Regions:
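Structured, active/binding-site neighborhoods that engage oxygen-rich ligands
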Residues: 1-341
Length: 341
């Protein structure tokens, strides 16, 4: 499997996970089961996750390894803000706060600190292109995504992006699922909220003792559905207990979204459909969890790993959130990243 194939699988998996999870955003697993039973079919288009990933890729194609926060801020000012003729539909809190800060004349890193949402998963959702750009080099992928993150996030929000970029970089080089999770942990502090959430999720799966990927996928017992049937069941409940901040009203919390996405990837043994359906079935920020799980598993399995029926539902970006990316298709973007690294 070559780099282009993995790049296409990564961004196609991201877009599919985003679109599949969009209707379930902010729902609980119980609500999802009551409405769909199991979410397996894409009903509509993607969200800001896909559009921001395309925008992040454009930054890499323009600046490569020399990317700086100043470059990212300049792109916001020249490509995003001038085209905002109304509300920034579907954008996350951190990105909305960043636009407001830039309009006030602030510069990074203050643009990511002045608002109250630096911990959001806005960077994690768009981190995959950095992993594509740095196959086999999680540390460099994490360094690059942080340059982007300093404009819109802070603290755990940046660490969540680093973890995803590192994981995708490892998957792009053919690392096995457990090694992908190890790569995510290797590029963030062990005592961070994000790292602790990932470790707790792995413990729930039994991955620390080496049982995840052997007994969790498709071998559910009564009352305990697993990744094989796409319904989290008791495993999902235990993952929620381990990492979800139940008392907080918003669901776009980077440490929990990243940990749940990695858990879905591990439970699905890197299979795109198993990982994504399990991830979106966890609810919460379901589109972002699905997008991250799809990016990791797509990088691991390549383009052929993305179900054909999903791939056929992914069209050019609508530009609903970011008009600058309207008409861009993730497969074209993936090809450009594969050539431009």
């Amino acid at each position: 499997m070559n780099h282009r194939d993995r790049a296409r699988g990564c961004l196609l998996g991201l877009a599919a996970g985003d679109a599949l999870g969009a209707p379930a955003e902010n729902m609980t697993p119980e609500q999802i089961i009551a409405r769909w039973g199991r979410l397996t079919e894409i009903e509509g288009g993607g969200t800001d996750d896909t559009e921001y990933a395309i925008f992040a890729a454009s930054l890499l194609l323009r600046h490569g390894h020399a990317l700086t926060p100043a470059d990212v801020a300049a792109a916001y000012r020249s490509e995003i803000i001038p085209l905002m003729t109304g509300p920034m539909r579907g954008a996350g809190f951190s990105e909305l706060g960043t636009v407001q800060a830039l309009r006030r004349g602030l510069e990074p890193p203050l643009t990511g600190r002045v608002h109250a949402h630096g911990w959001s998963d806005g960077l994690a959702m768009r981190a995959a292109p950095y992993g594509i750009f740095c196959p086999g080099d999680p540390a460099e992928a994490a360094r690059l995504v942080e340059q982007d993150g300093l404009v819109s996030g802070d603290g755990e929000g940046i660490l969540g992006g680093r973890a995803v970029a590192g994981a995708v970089a490892a998957a792009m080089a053919g690392a096995r699922p457990r090694e992908v999770a190890d790569a995510a942990l290797a590029v963030i502090p062990a005592d961070s909220w994000t790292a602790r959430a990932i470790v707790r999720a792995r413990e729930v799966l039994g991955d620390i003792s080496g049982t995840a990927g052997q007994s969790t996928a498709g071998q559910g017992t009564a009352g305990q559905s697993t990744a094989g049937d796409g319904i989290p069941g008791d495993l999902g409940r235990r993952l929620h207990e381990a990492v979800v901040v139940r008392h907080y009203p918003w669901t776009d919390v980077a440490p929990e979204a990243v940990a749940l996405a990695l858990a879905a990837f591990l439970a699905g043994e890197g299979d795109v459909e198993a990982s994504v359906t399990f991830g979106v079935g966890l609810g919460r920020d379901a589109d972002t969890i699905g997008a991250i799980a799809g990016a990791m598993s797509g990088a691991f399995q390549g383009e052929a790993g993305v179900p054909r029926r999903w791939a056929e539902r992914i069209g050019p970006a609508t530009g609903k959130c970011l008009p600058v990316v309207k008409g861009r298709h993730v497969l074209d973007v993936a090809d450009e990243l594969a050539k431009g690294r």
